Amino acid sequence: GTTYKRGMGALFMDSKADNIVLYDWLSFTSKIHTPEQIIDALGLFHVPWTNTKGAKGYQDRKYFSCISIHYNGRPDMGVWCEMSGQGCRTFETLSTLETDAMKKWRKLFDFIRSFGLKITRLDVAYDDHSGILDIGEVSRDAQCGMYVSKSDYWECIVSSKGTSIQIGSPQSKVLVRIYDKAAERGKQGEHWNRVEIQMRDDRAIQFSMIPLPIGEAFAGVLLNYLRYVEPDTDSNKWRWPMKDYWYNLVEDAERISIYTAPGMEYNEERCKRYVVNQAGNAIDACIQMYGLYEFERMIQDREVAPNPKYEQLIK
């Protein structure tokens, strides 16, 4: 397995990973706030947002490190804030709301609830690095109906990116996705399975209000929505005993009481790749035109505001 250690504000590899529960997507809308007020609510006024084209009917968007704030749609659309998994890591690492990552989330959820805003999507994920789940077994059990769920919809997909199982339709307010994260990332020989609960609307708001550590909250919602079970003579399938692996997963998730923010997935290698591959030709031309000494002076005197994403690397 692989783990991520905070070092220079980035992610670094270690030999043994901890299983963690983390927020992995947040999307919410407001009809009463400006984009600037949303940025303030995120505690991210100090970072360099760029203005770009919006999506899904919004004309404009403010963007920084996988966080998008869309605006200028129809009058009834308001402002839409969307944070992908990496956007969630950005928020945890750079937000000035609090010093502790979990307290940052609490403060943001309090803001959302206090104004009655709508959470259009909230993903909470459990990462299994220790070998609790065999993704092939989970897939076979799903196809054989060895589970109970609030939803009748299921699908299993096997591809070059690994195996994924989804219980719950894309339209439902709650769905569970189980997939081989290592295969998705192209990390051969690594055990990394993810169990993800995706919630919408009132279900997402309800999750944000659970007064428990994130591991217990995740385990409780998962047990209520989906269980893998062993066949039994009881006519009520919900009373069938749980599969050992599902019991172990729930038990493991429950004990995760401290929210461990993995940190921004921005490291030296990505920085180097960007400079060499994206800007390399322009840099080479500048050095040839102005000379190395003058080029270095131009970089030192640049008027662009510092980007915390890069500052994290050199702390």
What positions do the PLM features span?
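Structured, helix-rich domain cores that form ligand/interaction pockets
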Residues: G1-Y266, Y274-K315
